[in-house]
Amino acid sequence: QEVYDGQALYDVWNTYTFAIEKEYPSHHSNVYYHGEVNSMEMDLNVDVLAGKNKEEEHISELSRNYDDFYITTLSRTDNKLYAGKLVLSYPLAGGRISGGSEYSYTHRTSDFSGFGDEIEGTSDKIREKNLAFFLDCVYRLGGVNASAGLRYEDVYYDFYENSLYQSDESKHYRNLFPSLSLEGAMGQVQWALGYHIQVARPHYEQLKNAIHYGNRFTYLGGAPNLQPTYIHAAEMRAIYRDLQLSVGYNRYNDDILFSIEQITSCLLYTS
């Protein structure tokens, strides 16, 4: 790999990476029930999931003009998930109404050894509790199929660094997510309209403090203070014989993007 400083050749690197990844047996338990009582359908789903993995990485970065780098890192991750969902559905006035609740609890710990004197090691813990209630209605109004829904979420996200609670990175969200769709036909043209709001939460890998080594000038790290992305989506579709027209609009609030920052103040990099 050739590295340039402006137009001048700065250095030439040969990088070798050897990784040993051990994934321990995961444990998954599920309880499911489906039944019907007086025309009311009931679905109950409960899951328990636990797993952990360990990765050891050896990096040799050989330089033509400067010192060689030899780096060994060790990372461990432990995950536990408890989740349950209950849905009740009942026919009502020519349509159907369904509602229910779901709850999930996630406990995740990740430890990272760091890179010797170059990058500091980290020890993170995440606890997330998500409680949701939802209601959906489906009706046929004349020649139009209509459905509407509303979902409420109450999320607690607690972040710990080196066993200390971090109030700035911990979050509490309360959100409503509506949805609406209409489908029908005008002559030989079938049409559909839809609108909904959804959320895309950061992956845990994007939230942890551990730093991934690219080369001696490039590090990749997470950001515990990342916010969820809220997506407003609207769509219109029309079909006539073999022709299909689709128009969509999406608006992203707090979208997650990669950013590049230059570090010049010190050799030890912490996230």
Predicted features, each with a name:
Residues 26-28, 83, 132, 177, ...:
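Short beta-strand-initiation
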Residues 154-159, 187-234, 247-266:
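Surface-exposed extracellular loop regions of Gram-negative outer-membrane beta-barrel proteins
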Residues 1-14, 54-65, 109-118, 158-166, ...:
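Outer-membrane beta-barrel translocator domains and adjoining extracellular loop/strand segments
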Residues 269-270:
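Conserved small/polar residues in nucleotide/adenosyl-binding loops
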Residues 1, 17-161, 185, 189-190, ...:
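Face-selective signature of the C-terminal outer-membrane beta-barrel domain
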